[in-house]
């Protein structure tokens, strides 16, 4: 780097030029630039010394890089195209995903309580709510960052783009929260669907019991005469007791199955309610930011409209001024021409008068 030392004293002047890897150094009101940092040293026997640390400059530059060069180190707009911002692009994509999830969830909720209702349908509802909630939670930090960038931007267009995107994201949250609440309410009020693969064994078991009873009765009725009535009665009671135990076992299995279904439903409803609470917290947080920026949006839009109107009025005034200027120019030309003609006539008259 360039090193220039200027020393003033005793009426003399001394200039030394050289190269210094530390940067450009000018003592007595000079400038020192070290590795991208800015250091201004003014020391002139009673002057002042202003040192700005290099670390502060590096931190500010790192902040700029983290925000995709959309804003300079003072936090104001440095990139005209806000769509190049990574958070802006990510939020735009995820808004579309949330809207798709709302449509899918709406169709699934409409199936609850209908013949097409099934445990698989309810499982899809829970998975959709859970995955979308995670998406919203991970995206909320980026949306807050966009709100912060919008408040720092000096460009009115950039500010509007950021704030409208945040508002659109908040609207998607409201729609998703509403349909999730509807899903919870319908799951609580509609009866549980019975799985077809569970109905079949029960019916089959009952048919088997009926067939067994018929076979047993037929067997008892066709016994040989040498069996006495007591033995026949004991065997009949034994068969009836066996059939009763099978029925009790089937009833107990049915009860356990229903309990497991109820527990699964309650667990799914609880998860959906937790997701609603989480989404509501994010919604309230972002709503406050949107409300704070809403006045600014209206002010900016009003300012843009006022600027447009003023610009049109200014153009009209310029046109009128241009017309007036041309008219004045024409009038001046005519006046000058008339004066020249008058002067020429007077000159001719004066010429002939003097000749006489």
UniProtKB/Swiss-Prot annotation:
The keyword Transmembrane helix applies. The keyword Transport applies. InterPro entries: SNARE, Syntaxin, Syntaxin/epimorphin_CS, Syntaxin_N, T_SNARE_dom. This is Syntaxin-7A. GO terms for cellular component: endocytic vesicle membrane; endomembrane system; endosome; endosome membrane; SNARE complex. Residues 355-356 are vesicular. GO terms for biological process: endosome to lysosome transport; hypotonic response; intracellular protein transport; vesicle docking; vesicle fusion; vesicle-mediated transport. Residues 259-321 form the t-SNARE coiled-coil homology domain. GO terms for molecular function: SNAP receptor activity; SNARE binding. It is found in: Endosome membrane.
């Amino acid at each position: 780097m360039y090193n220039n030392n200027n020393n003033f004293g005793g009426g003399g002047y001394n200039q030394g030029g050289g190269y210094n890897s530390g940067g450009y150094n000018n003592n007595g009101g000079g400038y020192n630039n070290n590795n991208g940092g800015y250091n201004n040293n003014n020391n002139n026997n009673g002057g002042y010394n202003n040192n700005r640390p290099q670390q502060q400059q590096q931190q500010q530059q790192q902040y700029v890089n983290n925000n995709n060069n959309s804003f300079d180190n003072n936090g104001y707009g440095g990139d005209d195209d806000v769509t190049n911002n990574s958070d802006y692009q990510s939020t735009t994509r995820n808004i579309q995903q949330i809207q798709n999830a709302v449509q899918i969830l709406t169709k699934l909720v409409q199936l609850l309580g209908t013949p097409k209702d099934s445990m698989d349908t309810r499982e899809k509802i829970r998975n959709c709510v859970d995955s979308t909630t995670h998406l919203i939670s991970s995206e909320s930090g980026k949306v807050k960052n966009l709100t912060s960038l919008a408040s720092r931007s000096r460009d009115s267009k950039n500010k509007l783009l950021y704030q409208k995107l945040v508002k659109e994201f908040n609207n998607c949250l409201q729609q998703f929260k509403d349909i999730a609440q509807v899903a919870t309410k319908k799951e609580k009020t509609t009866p549980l669907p019975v799985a077809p693969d569970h109905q079949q064994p029960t019916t089959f078991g009952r048919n088997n019991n009926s067939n067994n009873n018929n076979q047993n009765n037929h067997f008892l009725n066709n016994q040989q005469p040498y069996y006495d009535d007591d033995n026949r009665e004991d065997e009949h009671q034994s068969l009836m007791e066996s059939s009763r135990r099978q029925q009790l076992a089937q009833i107990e299995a049915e009860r356990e199955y229903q309990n497991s279904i109820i527990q699964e439903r309650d667990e799914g409803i609880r998860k959906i309610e937790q997701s609603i609470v989480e989404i509501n917290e994010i919604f309230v947080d972002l709503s406050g930011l949107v409300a704070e920026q809403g006045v600014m949006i209206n002010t900016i839009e009003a300012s843009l409209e006022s600027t447009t109107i003023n610009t049109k009025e200014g153009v009209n005034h310029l046109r009128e001024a241009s017309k007036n200027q041309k008219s004045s120019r024409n009038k001046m030309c005519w006046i000058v021409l008339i004066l020249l003609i008058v002067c020429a006539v007077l000159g001719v008259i004066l010429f002939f008068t003097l000749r006489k």
